[in-house]
Amino acid sequence: MRVPSLTLAVACAALLAPAAARHHIAEEPVARREGAVGAADLLAKVRGCAQISRGRYRSDEGAPAAVPVCATRDAVFWKADLDIDCDGRPGPRCNRRTDPLFSAATAFQQSDGRDLSAESLPYIVVPAVSRIWDHGVRGGSVAAVVYRNRVQYAVVGDLGPRGIIGEASYATARGLGINPDPRGGGAASGVTYIVFKDSQVKPIEDHAAAVATGQRLARLFVRGKWPGVRPPTSRRPPAAPRR
């Protein structure tokens, strides 16, 4: 989000990729359809909204609170904009020189203790827990981010301001074909974030594992065959023994 960081643990400003990156976007890989489940398949499952948040979130500082968090049996989701998070381990595109709001910390760390790299790891940002939504979402939870006809699998990798939603890493934006430079990039609307319940990738930095897990859970989500859901059983009392 395009606001200053709150604290190290809740660091979440909308962060910026360098302007020079504009010249390299076409050279980066783009996830047109990262998996067998297409964007239309996922969007068809999140058409309605059974709201679970107590209120609604703002997409940016000063914007109206208009974004609810919704739930199905298998996932939570929201539809918002996409602001660029460029926090974490510095690199050529995300650093103090290229990003005036840069923070070298992310709320969750890699298995080696280092902070995540926004420019190399696809991750999303969830709001810090508040009265609006006490989500219990863990670092490493698996998400499918949908924009137009593209699906990018990612993990929950950072926490944002308590009242703002709609943010993802530089790498997530790049994978969706969105300009990752926040000075002229991001997406104003049309981004759907789906976080699969009870999912987690370890280590959090293993993107291949996030993709494999995301593909599997997306297939189950679309088919309505979520793991752990038992088929209904008969409640009839047992038959009396024969004499």
Where are the model-predicted features located?
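Cell wall/extracellular polymer interaction/catalysis modules
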Residues: 22-150, 163, 175-183, 197-233
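Intrinsically disordered, low-complexity linker and terminal regions at domain boundaries
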Residues: 184-192
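Short, solvent-exposed secondary-structure boundary/capping segments
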Residues: 162-172
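Soluble periplasmic/extracytoplasmic beta-strand elements of cell-envelope proteins
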Residues: 123-125, 155, 192-194
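Short beta-strand-centered aromatic/proline hotspots
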Residues: 152-161
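Compositionally biased, proline/threonine/alanine/serine-rich low-complexity intrinsically disordered stretches
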Residues: 233-243
